[in-house]
Curated annotation (Swiss-Prot):
InterPro entries: Ala_racemase, Ala_racemase/Decarboxylase_C, Ala_racemase_C, Ala_racemase_N, Ala_racemase_pyridoxalP-BS, PLP-binding_barrel. It comes from Vibrio atlanticus (strain LGP32) (Vibrio splendidus (strain Mel32)). Keywords: Isomerase, Pyridoxal phosphate. Catalyzes the interconversion of L-alanine and D-alanine. May also act on other amino acids. This is Alanine racemase. The gene is alr. GO terms for biological process: D-alanine biosynthetic process. GO terms for cellular component: cytosol. Pathway: Amino-acid biosynthesis; D-alanine biosynthesis; D-alanine from L-alanine: step 1/1. The active site is at 34 (proton acceptor), 254 (proton acceptor). The keyword Cytoplasm does not apply. It holds the Pfam family Ala_racemase_C.
Length: 358
């Protein structure tokens, strides 16, 4: 019997990608697989994302892992290259890059490359994290057009800061600014990630860049992915390794921060923060056991957590417990913990067994 296992449902992944295509039927899809495929396994996800037209990553090491694994579709470095020494690697491995700052632009201008690199100019349309500011935009465009190391036509992208908040005007303002700057440009454009894809159709343009929604996790605080017609790709499970009688007034776990108000049965599950399950999960965080949700009772430890099974529980050692996934949305668990589901799925450690099912 294995302890913590992340089961990756490749049929769910295929369903989600089909859903994405249906919501942006005239767009190309750049599946974002950074952070080890959002914790789902970089190479496995890429190999089974057959309908994707390209892949987006954050680190050059991720791009090289994809190439080494046989992925031949276009790959884009979403943050661009970190040093001029990366540029020959991009050329050798046919990796596209974002350019978002003067340092990257200067490095391209001064490099001696065998062949030009496909470049996406990132525009700061209002998030103010990365990108050429509107007043810098024309200068960047002119220099990139003149640079022999840049493949033509130049491409254009930006990123939303608040697309998951549907009652804010920020996304409309960002879209309008980006469109006004890039209107009439020859190259392809990309603006929408997961929330933009789902909620802001005016942002779809030539390419969409779905990330978290591909994995069946919602980008919105008030809607689960299932509500939106997507299936969870990851289901995280473990097993009960003990079922103990706990009397009213007895405390459980480190610090004794949960005290039973009744005689009950407490289940011990073989997963903890050493597996990436958050230590900060408070009492009451749900776990799914034998067809019902039961609450965490006591502090999460490195290798175990404890749940209140109830006084009449018939659960036994070896029974499966689902931490999140098909029977328990990761969004619901994240809300209890005070985080986002993105963090849950990307923080699993190497101790968790990965199983791919179809």
């Amino acid at each position: 019997m294995k302890a913590a296992t992340a089961s990756i449902d490749l049929n769910a992944l295929e369903h989600n990608l089909n859903q994405i295509k249906s919501k942006a039927p005239h767009c190309k899809v750049m599946s974002v697989v950074k952070a080890n495929g959002y914790g789902h396994g970089l190479l496995h996800i890429a190999k089974h994302s057959k309908s994707s037209d390209a892949f987006g990553v954050a680190r050059i090491e991720e791009a090289l892992q994809l190439r080494a694994g046989g992925i031949v579709k276009p790959i884009l470095l979403l943050e661009g290259f970190y040093s001029s020494g990366d540029l020959p690697i991009l050329v050798t491995n046919n990796i596209q890059t974002v350019v978002h700052c003067e340092e990257q632009l200067s490095a391209l201008e001064n490099a001696e490359l065998e062949t030009p690199v496909v470049v996406w100019l990132k525009v700061d349309s209002g998030m103010h994290r990365l990108g050429a500011r509107p007043e810098q935009y024309q200068n960047f465009v002119e220099r990139l057009h003149q640079c022999a190391n840049v493949a033509k036509p130049l491409r254009y992208m930006s990123h939303f800061g608040c697309a998951d908040e549907l009652d804010r005007a920020t996304t409309v303002e960002q879209t309008e600014l980006f469109l006004s700057l890039t209107d009439g440009c020859e190259g392809e454009r990309s603006l929408a990630a997961s929330a933009g894809l789902l909620a802001w159709p005016d942002s779809h343009l030539d390419w969409v860049r779905p990330g978290i929604i591909s994995y069946g996790v919602s980008p919105f605080a008030d809607k689960s992915a299932q509500d939106l017609g997507f299936y969870p790709v990851m289901t995280l499970t473990s097993h009960l390794i003990a079922v103990r009688d706990v009397k009213a007034g007895e405390s459980v776990g480190y610090g004794g921060n949960w005290t039973s108000e009744r005689d009950t049965k407490v289940g011990v599950i073989a997963i903890g923060y050493g597996d990436g399950y958050p230590r900060t999960a408070p009492n009451g965080t749900p776990v799914f056991v034998n067809g019902r949700k039961v609450p965490i009772a006591g502090r999460v430890s490195m290798d175990m957590l404890t749940v209140d099974l109830g006084p009449d529980a018939a659960d036994k050692v070896g029974d499966e417990a689902t931490l999140w996934g098909k029977d328990l949305p990761s969004e619901e668990v994240a809300e209890h913990i005070g985080t986002i589901a993105y963090e849950l799925v990307t923080k699993l450690t190497s101790r968790v067994a990965m199983e791919y099912v179809k």
